[in-house]
């Protein structure tokens, strides 16, 4: 990969992880049809005071609105199409001649829905209108803290904005239930696309869009930093869940071309957010998306990339199965760390050099690099892989050549102060790989049942985190142990599921790690001697049909 060049056309940027149902900003919609709430100061259109939900359509009613049978032209912002029937242009895309629904933010929005949203906006008071407009900058769901930080200013001071939000919610917002375990039970909302379109138009007309988008991007920076801090402090599942839930807004902030300033001025913000979310790309199975976003942001920067940005670029190349492409980036990152005086980045780079050497099968070099990483890394690293990850990497490098040294590395990792977190705060990614090492060591001692139990545990932990590479490696190790135990069909099912996983997640250039290649070759050699071609193909297809999640529960 060459830093400074935009991503190739068609490069995937979607969810290539294993966690399902975490991407949409709204995981459950609670349709609002409750009682009308008190209004705001100001006059209605008929001159009377107050505002109630009965004065205009609720968000639910707007979403359920359908076009009439008359085929009337689409009404946008209260303005119909011209008398000659020309299609109205919305966000650069004309609607159909018969008033067909318009696509907004990837979803079809009917003319009646837009008209109903206009009527609801028109019946709001001044404060509700202003907040309606400002909330249109959010791409996904949001909570009260986000509203206060992004939208509170001027005519909407922080002391009053939450009361305005409560009055506006029944008219323009839908409550959502997307809280994760341990989070404070505070209401969260989502603005339907018809309402958002109306608010975005008014915000632009008012001339406030530029400052609101910038405030939204600064809020996204803080959000990404919070997720990174949670990951480092041991709240790894919470960090992943937070990043996934807020990904619609974070994704917008990671694209410098959507900023009101020049793309080069906002590229640093985009790079910072992308680097802060390193764990989401590296440890949670979204390497392709992270690689695309980082390349895009770096291509718009005017100055040299930071050491951490180059470190992440190299790590993403490695996770994408291109270790040779990671080597030159590692050299650039080292030079950048020396140039910028970023001593903390040196430990990150030593760890990544060890991971790259291990990927390529250079186990002795990998062990040396992991030892250097431990020497360079602080007691409590504030960014990147933990000391526990370095100890586990060292053990993984030694487990097939020096099992006693590998066991000693695992023991040292358990004694390390960084590794002595509570069960809730452990490094779950390193924990999953440690079970792979324990499975290898148990197999070395001839304890196949115990080895299979460790491999199965590693598989489940990697699936839980969403790591495709880790899950594939653990499944292939479990398949080898099943072959050794005489369970040929179960082993073939696991290998078939791994093939499907790698095909669906990685592109054609992906090359598995050398230790995975060796494990796979051992299993397939035995399976080909036990099953003919047709039987083996059928077993692979059956495993692909059932999938790793199902097989992990049965193993």
Q: What residue spans do the PLM features occupy?
A:
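C-terminal boundary/linker of central alpha/beta nucleotide-binding cores
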Residues: 1, 114, 118-206, 210-214, ...
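Loop-to-helix "switch" segment enriched in basic
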Residues: 1-4, 31, 91, 97-128, ...
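Tandem amphipathic alpha-helical repeat scaffolds
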Residues: 230, 270-284, 307-323, 344-362, ...
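Residue signature of alpha-solenoid helical repeat architecture, marking inter-repeat boundaries
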Residues: 244, 264, 268, 304, ...
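Amphipathic alpha-helical segments of tetratricopeptide repeats
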Residues: 254-255, 295-299, 331-342, 371-382, ...
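C-terminal non-catalytic interaction modules
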Residues: 489-555
């Amino acid at each position: 990969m060459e830093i400074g060049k935009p991503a190739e056309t068609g490069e995937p940027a979607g969810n290539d992880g294993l966690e399902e149902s975490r991407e949409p900003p709204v995981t459950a919609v609670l349709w609002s049809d409750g009682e009308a709430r008190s209004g705001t100061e100001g006059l209605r259109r008929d001159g009377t005071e107050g505002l109630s939900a009965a004065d205009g359509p609720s968000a639910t009613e707007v979403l359920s609105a359908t076009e009439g049978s008359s085929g009337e032209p689409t009404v946008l912002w209260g303005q119909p199409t011209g008398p000659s029937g020309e299609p109205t242009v919305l966000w650069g895309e004309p609607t159909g001649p018969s008033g067909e629904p318009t696509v907004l933010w990837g979803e079809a929005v009917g003319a009646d829905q837009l008209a109903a949203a206009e009527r609801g906006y028109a019946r709001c008071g001044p404060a509700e209108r202003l907040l309606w407009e400002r909330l249109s900058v959010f791409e996904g769901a949001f909570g009260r803290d986000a509203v206060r930080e992004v939208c509170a200013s001027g005519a909407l001071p922080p002391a009053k904005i939450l009361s305005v939000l409560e009055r506006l919610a029944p008219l323009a917002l839908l409550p959502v239930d997307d809280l994760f375990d341990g989070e404070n039970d505070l209401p969260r909302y989502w603005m339907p696309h018809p309402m958002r379109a109306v608010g975005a138009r008014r915000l632009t007309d008012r001339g406030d869009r530029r400052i609101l988008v910038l405030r939204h991007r600064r809020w996204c920076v803080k959000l990404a930093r919070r997720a990174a801090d949670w990951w480092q402090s041991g709240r790894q599942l919470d960090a992943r869940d937070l990043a996934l839930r807020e990904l619609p807004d974070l994704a917008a902030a990671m694209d410098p071309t959507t900023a009101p300033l020049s793309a080069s001025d906002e590229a640093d913000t985009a790079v910072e957010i992308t680097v802060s979310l390193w764990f989401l790309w590296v440890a949670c199975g979204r390497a392709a998306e992270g690689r695309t976003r980082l390349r895009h942001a770096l291509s718009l920067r005017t100055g040299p990339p930071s050491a951490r940005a180059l470190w992440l670029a190299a790590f993403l190349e490695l996770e994408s199965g291109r270790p040779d492409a990671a080597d030159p980036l590692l050299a650039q990152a080292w030079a950048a760390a020396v140039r910028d005086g970023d001593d903390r980045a040196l430990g990150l780079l030593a760890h990544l050099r060890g991971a790259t050497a291990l990927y390529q099968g250079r186990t002795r070099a990998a062990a040396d690099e992991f030892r250097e990483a431990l020497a360079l890394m602080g007691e409590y690293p504030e960014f990147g892989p933990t000391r526990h990850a370095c100890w586990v990497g060292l053990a993984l490098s030694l487990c097939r050549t020096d099992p006693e040294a590998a066991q000693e590395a695992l023991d040292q990792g358990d004694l390390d102060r960084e590794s002595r977190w509570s069960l809730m705060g452990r490094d779950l990614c390193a924990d999953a790989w440690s079970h792979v090492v324990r499975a290898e060591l148990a197999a070395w001692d001839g304890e196949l049942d115990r080895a299979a139990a460790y491999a199965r545990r590693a598989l489940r932990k990697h699936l839980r985190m969403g790591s495709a590479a880790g899950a594939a490696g653990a499944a292939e190790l479990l398949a080898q142990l099943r072959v050794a135990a005489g369970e040929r069909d179960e082993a073939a099912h696991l290998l078939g599921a791994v093939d499907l996983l790698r095909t669906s997640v990685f592109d054609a250039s992906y090359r598995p790690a050398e230790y995975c290649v060796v494990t796979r070759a051992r299993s397939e050699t035995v399976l080909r001697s036990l099953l003919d071609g047709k039987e083996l193909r059928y077993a692979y297809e059956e495993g692909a049909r059932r999938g790793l999640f199902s097989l992990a529960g049965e193993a």
